[in-house]
Amino acid sequence: VAFRDYHSTTHENGALNPRLEAEAGHITFQPYSDLPALHLAHDPAEIEANGSWYRNFQYAVEQERGLDSVEDLFNPCTLTFNFNTHEKVSLIAATEPRDVSHADSYRKAEIERRSALNKPANETHRLVTTLTTAADQFIAARQTGETVIAGYHWFADWGRDTMIALPGLTLVNNRWDVAKGI
């Protein structure tokens, strides 16, 4: 894990808290106190809290752009699943605790949520429904409501970019409540 802003890179450091909170079916890891915790909900697995740094990941595109192109990443643990004894295995990564026993219902709810994006516009053309679903990825949740990450993934929310993108992301899809909130 990097736990960083997308404009920076992570390097091995002593500020990272390697401690895991593990209980049956759930792991919580919060490497830095000012960032949200990472919650991993999992089916039965063997957990090894190894806390290892993997050094010197090379990013060719960043190097071409003259940016910091070398990064260290921290692996808080290893989960080992026995696929021979399970029909399927679920792993949920989130910033809020999740219950792995609800993995199927989470998946179903997300499929229904994405499908519902096209209902207000009463649209069935595959290209349009694909674009509508893709447009939703630029709308991000904040503690104070929703925002537009118009230059996702390179930029944060900026007022000018938000106003340029807002009509195509919300208004043409009849997502008036989302537009109003933004």
Residue locations for each model-derived region?
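Acidic, mature catalytic/reactive cores of soluble proteins
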Residues: 1-182
